[in-house]
Amino acid sequence: MADMKSIQADTREKMNKAIEAFENNLSVLRTGRANPGILKKIVVDYYGSQMPIDQVASITTPDPRTLVITPWDRGALNPIEKAIRDSDLGLNPNNKGDTIFISLPMLTEERRKDLVKNAKNYAEDARIAVRNLRKHALDEVKKVEGLGEDEIKRGEADVQKITDEYVARVESVFQKKEQEILG
């Protein structure tokens, strides 16, 4: 049976993972600047294997509006181009023989609002994940044997403090991303 400290540590660890997942989701949202992270979820069919794009090529940003993808094997050039074209990012790769250039167009106001809306959805998903972890932790607190009513209440209050802290972190990360998108 777990004790209060291990429940709190486990809850913090799981909530950290929820925040990391949230940040990963946000990293693929396009902002006004070129960011190699937007290609993170692209998978390339490389000699029959599905591989993340960053494992078959280097991705650089020579300027704020351009991504340059340089495959480590020229045979990967066309599959990379196809994977980018087929993705839902709406990018148009330009194959230059040994590298692929992607020019990122300016974001329209409408597109920025859509991106903020997506970010809000990711933030809400993260908040829900944190709250679900709180519920699980509260259930665990109630299962600890040998605790009096006051100790259970104190444990529940501690779990709530942890939850509030992580919900605030979600909000902070979201607001930062929102400024990045709208800015």
Curated annotation (Swiss-Prot):
GO terms for molecular function: ribosomal large subunit binding. Its main location: cytoplasm. GO terms for cellular component: cytoplasm. Keywords: Cytoplasm, Protein biosynthesis. It is found in: Cytoplasm. Responsible for the release of ribosomes from messenger RNA at the termination of protein biosynthesis. May increase the efficiency of translation by recycling ribosomes from one round of translation to another. This is Ribosome-recycling factor.
